[in-house]
């Protein structure tokens, strides 16, 4: 789940809600399901804080989705990411992330956000 069920697209905020029968609502605390499922096993509200920090370092002209996917692709152990997409515009945006070359300078800041919000909760699972 490279975009953490949409969390790393920036489409959710603290006012977002889910239907009672929506699996997102069921796993809003990040403790249900198996590793890597809804919200990648991270508490929804905690992840929103991370998203806010990432938005603050987002370069002009780059979406949060693109930044997130490129960050994954910049790890030596990763050769491909398979994100979800609901339409052809999402596909185009997602594939264009591999062509970004101007985020190397942000890696330390992105890694810091990952460490602060996600590392303890999920890193040991991978």
Regions found by a protein language model. Give the residues of each.
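Glycine/threonine-rich phosphate-binding loop and adjacent beta-strand/alpha-helix elements that clamp
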Residues: 67
């Amino acid at each position: 789940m490279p975009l953490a069920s949409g969390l790393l697209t920036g489409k959710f905020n603290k006012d977002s809600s889910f239907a009672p029968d929506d699996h997102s609502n069921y796993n809003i605390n990040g403790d249900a399901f198996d590793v890597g499922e809804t919200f990648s096993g991270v508490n929804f509200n905690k992840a929103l804080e991370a998203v806010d920090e990432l938005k603050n370092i987002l370069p002009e002209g780059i979406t949060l989705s693109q930044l997130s996917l490129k960050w994954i692709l910049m790890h030596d152990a990763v050769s491909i990411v398979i994100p979800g997409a609901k339409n052809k515009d999402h596909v185009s945006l997602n594939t264009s992330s591999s062509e970004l070359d101007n985020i190397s300078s942000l890696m330390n800041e992105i890694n810091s956000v990952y460490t602060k919000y996600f590392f303890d909760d999920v890193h040991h699972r991978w």
